[in-house]
Regions:
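ATP-binding N-terminal substructure of ATP-dependent carboxylate-amine bond-forming enzymes
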Residues: 1-100, 104-107
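Anion (oxyanion) recognition and catalysis
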Residues: 24, 84, 110, 134, ...
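Short acidic-hydrophobic, aromatic-tinged amphipathic segments that line or gate anion-handling sites
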Residues: 47-52, 121-125, 155-156
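Structural alpha-helical scaffold elements that stabilize or flank donor/cofactor-binding regions
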Residues: 60-61, 132, 167
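A conserved helix-loop-beta module that forms one wall/lid of the active-site cleft
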Residues: 91-153
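Short beta-strand-to-turn element immediately C-terminal to the catalytic PLP-Schiff-base lysine
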Residues: 123, 152-157, 188-192, 216-218, ...
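Phosphate-binding core of ATP-grasp and ATP-grasp-like enzymes
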Residues: 167-220, 226-258, 262-270, 278, ...
Length: 363
């Protein structure tokens, strides 16, 4: 019997494209569902062109594939439930629903996985903001939607309450106490439904709420790094994880606080393609297929730089001058401002000397 599988990927952006490349290297066939015929995955896989919530298209994908996965969390979970058969979607839809709603996510992290999160409260209207202690700093986030800083309002004084009240009256929200952290970090973990494997802790630098630079390993103590990895594994085991999960965290001087989870490979893990013996995309494919998972080894300290639309020319010049560094371009046709167009990975044990592309250009 052939071990070749047909893998259906919901979403044809850069994450779906890199999942597909890993699957193809392993000898599998890939079919992608995406609304755009010219999506990045169209360069490496067959594409069913349809909206993500098109139940007929989801059924066509399901009927054509041995296993399904998704590249992002904004997938119609109800639509998936309507078409999937037992075992067809190893990640399941429970994880989707948890990651789609910050209220569900906070409840899962604090009460089921029992990891440390920032103090928070559920906000259903502006009335829930009337008694907050303005000697503290807060972040108000909509329960659903929002990415790269959208759907959020920082509250530091009464001057911020008008916008915060409007946000609270527009949608269910979560109010989090602001964490005075030293570093933003993340941990990639992959599971196959039984076992898990974990990647090195990554240090992340954001500009305008968009990831700009990832440094591996993160510059934190060994004890904090082990604590961060243990938290990620605990979350993965609570989920009986299949595939790859990213746990985003804050590192303080003496603690790790979990911020949120992404039920898929993550921008901060792209360095793993060159810097580890297996990438986060490799372990994702192995995980959803229920295959044995490798132990992850980092070849050498590495840095990943995001290439946004306004950075493309600078990135192309950079790799011309530094041909040993690795440029990945995703094949997006239009280089819009702040649109993720690619990334560069390089080996360096002096990460402060690696200049982000946005410096001197535009973040």
């Amino acid at each position: 019997m052939s071990s070749t599988k047909t893998i259906g990927i919901i979403g044809g952006g850069q994450l779906g494209q890199m999942m597909a490349i890993s699957a193809i290297y392993m000898g599998h066939k890939v079919i992608t569902l995406d609304p755009a015929a010219d999506c990045p995955s169209s360069r490496v896989s067959e594409v069913i062109v349809a909206p993500y919530d098109d139940v007929d298209a989801l059924r066509q994908l399901a009927d054509s594939c041995d296993v399904l996965t998704y590249e992002f969390e904004n997938v119609d979970a109800d639509g998936l439930d309507a078409v999937i058969k037992d075992g067809l979607l190893p990640q399941g839809t429970d994880l989707l629903r948890i990651s789609q709603n910050r209220i569900f996510e906070k409840d899962f992290l604090s009460n089921k996985a029992k990891v440390t999160v920032a103090p928070y409260k559920v906000v259903t209207s502006s009335l829930d903001l009337e008694d907050i202690d303005l000697s503290k700093k807060y972040v108000l986030k909509t329960a659903t939607g929002g990415y790269d800083g959208h759907g959020q309002k920082v509250i530091t004084s009464t001057d911020d309450l008008e916008e915060a009240n409007a946000l609270a009256n527009s949608a269910e929200c979560v109010l989090e106490e602001f964490v005075n952290f030293d570093l933003e970090i993340s941990v990639i973990v992959s599971g196959n439904g039984k076992d898990v494997t974990v990647f090195p802790v990554q240090e992340n630098i954001h500009r305008n709420n968009i990831l700009s630079k990832t440094i591996v390993p993160a510059r934190i103590s060994d004890s904090l790094a082990e604590k961060a990895k243990a938290m990620a594994v605990k979350i993965a085991e609570q989920l009986n994880l299949s595939g790859t999960l990213c746990v985003e965290m804050f590192a303080t001087a003496d603690d790790i606080i979990v911020n949120e989870i992404a039920p898929r490979p993550h921008n901060s893990g792209h360095y793993s393609i060159e810097a580890c013996d297996f990438s986060q995309f490799d372990t994702h494919i192995l995980g959803v297929l229920g295959a044995p998972l490798p132990t992850i080894h980092l070849h050498a300290p590495a840095v990943m730089l995001n290439v946004l639309g306004q950075h493309v020319e600078a990135a192309e010049r950079y790799v011309t001058e530094n041909p040993s560094d690795h440029l990945h371009m995703y094949g997006k046709l239009e280089a819009k401002h702040n649109r993720k167009m690619g990334h560069v990975t390089l080996f360096s044990d002096e990460p402060d000397n690696v200049v982000e592309f946005g410096k001197g250009i535009d973040f």
